[in-house]
Amino acid sequence: MTILDDILVKTRQVIARDQASVPAAELVAAAKDLPVCRDFHGSLAATDQVRLIAEVKRASPSAGLIREDFDPPTIAKSYEDGGAACISVLTDEPFFQGSLDYLRQVRSAVDLPILRKDFIVDPYQLLQARVAGADAVLLIAECLSPQQLIEMDEQASELGLQTLIELYEPENLAPVLATKTRLVGINNRDLRTFETDLQHCVRLAADIPSDRLVVGESGIRTAADVAMLKAGGIKAILVGESLMRQPDITIATKALLAS
C-alpha cells in the first residue's frame, strides 16, 4: 500500500465520522444562506507577476510537525501582509494535523480567497468546504477517476466553489483538461513516494493550453525557484512548508515574491 492509498482509507473514515455527526442535509440548508464566494481564479490572474497561494500547514507525513507556534489566523494575516494572493488551508486531520476549524478561523481573519486543501473524494466534503468559508477546493487527479473529476468539478461549481485540479502523473493531464476548471495544479511531489522534482511542473506546463492558469506546487523555497518557474510558464505557486518554517512569515513571503 502506498502513502496515498493509506491517506485515502483514513480520509473515508473521517468522512463517515463527520457524516454521522453532521448530516449532509444540515450542510445543504446552511449553504443556502451564504454570501457569494470570492474569486479565487481572478485573484491569481490579476497581474503578470507570479501569484502566491500561501498555505496554512501544521504538519506533513514527510516533515512531521512544521511549526510549534501554530495560530492559523495570525499566520494567514502574515501571508496577506506579505503579498499573498490567496490562502490555502490544509484540513486533512490524520496525516497533516489539519482541521476545518482552521479554515473557519482563517476566514474570519482575512479577506483573501481561501482554498480547502484536502483529499476530496466525496461531495460531502464540498458541502463542508462551502459552509466553513472556502471559496475553492483542491481536487487531485490521482484520487479520482476521470468521470469523478468531471462530476466533482461540476458539483463544486453548483455550490459556487471554484476548483484547483492537481495532477502529478502526465497521463492524468487529459482527464484534468476534460473538466471545466480554469486552474490546473502540477504537483512536484509524487504522492506515492513523497519525492520532489521542481522541474516536473515546468515539463508538464508546456502541454497545458493558455486558457488554463497553471499553479506550481511543492518544493518551492526561494525567489530563484520562483523565477525559474515563471520562465517555464508557471503563473502561480502554492507554497507552505518553506514559509511556515520562517520566524517572520511576512518578511519571508515578501522575499519569496521578490523575483
Swiss-Prot record:
Similarity field: Belongs to the TrpC family.
Top EC category: lyase
GO biological process: L-tryptophan biosynthetic process
Pathway: Amino-acid biosynthesis; L-tryptophan biosynthesis; L-tryptophan from chorismate: step 4/5
Annotated protein name in UniProt: Indole-3-glycerol phosphate synthase
Keywords (A to Z) from UniProt: Amino-acid biosynthesis, Aromatic amino acid biosynthesis, Decarboxylase, Lyase, Tryptophan biosynthesis
Species of the source: Rhodopirellula baltica (strain DSM 10527 / NCIMB 13988 / SH1)
SUPFAM superfamilies xrefs: Ribulose-phoshate binding barrel
EC number(s) recorded for this UniProt protein: 4.1.1.48
Catalytic activities: 1-(2-carboxyphenylamino)-1-deoxy-D-ribulose 5-phosphate + H(+) = (1S,2R)-1-C-(indol-3-yl)glycerol 3-phosphate + CO2 + H2O
Amino-acid biosynthesis recorded as keyword: yes
Entries under PANTHER family matching the protein: INDOLE-3-GLYCEROL-PHOSPHATE SYNTHASE, TRYPTOPHAN BIOSYNTHESIS PROTEIN
Pfam families membership: IGPS
Record-linked InterPro entries: Aldolase_TIM (IPR013785), Indole-3-glycerol_P_synth (IPR045186), Indole-3-glycerol_P_synth_dom (IPR013798), Indole-3-GlycerolPSynthase_CS (IPR001468), RibuloseP-bd_barrel (IPR011060)
CDD domains referenced in this protein's UniProt entry, alphabetically: IGPS (cd00331)
Superkingdom classification of source: Bacteria
GO-annotated molecular function: indole-3-glycerol-phosphate synthase activity; phosphoribosylanthranilate isomerase activity
